[in-house]
């Protein structure tokens, strides 16, 4: 039996879609030196090759891809967006604006100088900035009629040009950004590793790699004469056992009665005490605790140690420094801090935002008490609130369909901006109401990644049919322009952040990468800095940059 694979793919669009996805994702796993091709590039290049071979797809049917992607981006940005925008994000907002406005200026200037059509120029800008939201906003402006173009053939030609420009410039944008991240600190005689260590020393930050990856343990000891001499009539607060060792006393048994001590309690000879702490903390205890006096008793040791993810929600906590939580008073241990899916360094001076996730371990009742003070414990359910997801998706589409008329000029946000606003709102409400709009992070990641990959298939198939012909005519101009759009905004943002805002170089580079929304480059920066300190800057600009880039893509098309 002979199977004509090409004919089968031409006849079955769904089969073609998933074949391109499977081949592209496999290609994305290939590594060159230390750099992985990545899913986006793998799928895009594969789709271009299939498009060049004559395979086509109704790209309108793939619009659900960019809609899912931009809606999920909004949900992720929602918990931190308003905190960054209104409180501590002045530097990050300015850096994002420097990158975006300079990129727009260069794009428009080169469009005029080289005579490029606006579709090609906008796609070139999106690819050069490795910013898919720009492409999403631009394509939506064309499809929704916001561009003012009514001729379907011109709209299709412009969308094809978008795809060609993006496909030509994406790889150049990614490689040049990574190259800049390595080269610029050396040219400025700045070592990212040293800059990271400087922040760590100034703020007392513990690196993520040094955090505990196991739960605290419980051990019990009997108070003997040696320990009484060491205590010297001091109460537990004055002894400061937690400050010295990292252990705290959870229970005391005195005369057969179990009690939870407070800071005023004074230990007496014969008391049996249960201490909670990491193994290395127990090892730091004074020998008077341990030498032959350990107690093995079920009632004394019957404590439930848990690890929970606490979401910051309460207004009286948002805006405070991590050190102000005084976790030691609650007998809890902080394992990590996560913001916008980025694991942050253990910086006790970091300002907490609503939606931040604190992974905390300790005795169950203490962790629950801390969660009540800070916010709420993240739901462990794997079931998504699909009703809220669908309702806010509908709201986003409705917002995008609203147009305002000023005489003969009509203006609207478009589906991309509408879905982004709805997603941000859902994410913000989720951070404030634990049972509303819950979407497991794994499900959110899958929806976002699948949406992006489906969108990339549409872009690649659309561009592939005439990409190589276009490259033969305008390829060198596009590559030069792409390099300018990629490099110049980064250099300007670096100079602005370093000499005007006086930012630490590690934080500055993280913020610039966040303004470019380029996760692969962020991994390279962390590796180059031998630290996760740059993630502090990345999280600061990432959320707001996604919003600005989407709006920018729409505005560029409308203005032309």
Curated annotation (Swiss-Prot):
Subcellular location: Cell membrane
InterPro entries found in the cross-reference section: AAE_transporter (IPR050144), RCK_C (IPR006037), RCK_C_sf (IPR036721), Transp_YbjL_put (IPR023017), YidE_YbjL (IPR006512)
GO CC terms: plasma membrane
Transmembrane segments: 5-25, 37-57, 66-86, 91-111, 161-181, 386-406, 409-429, 452-472, 477-497, 506-526, 539-559
One Pfam family in the UniProt entry: Asp-Al_Ex
Entry keyword annotation includes Cell inner membrane: no
Membrane topology value: Multi-pass membrane protein
One of the GO biological process terms: potassium ion transport
The name this protein goes by in its record: Putative transport protein PBPRA2420
Keywords (A to Z) from UniProt: Cell membrane, Membrane, Repeat, Transmembrane, Transmembrane helix, Transport
GO function term, MF aspect, one: monoatomic cation transmembrane transporter activity
Domain RCK C-terminal positions: 203-292, 293-377
Similarity section: Belongs to the AAE transporter (TC 2.A.81) family. YbjL subfamily.
Gene3D superfamilies: Regulator of K+ conductance, C-terminal domain
Repeat among keywords: yes
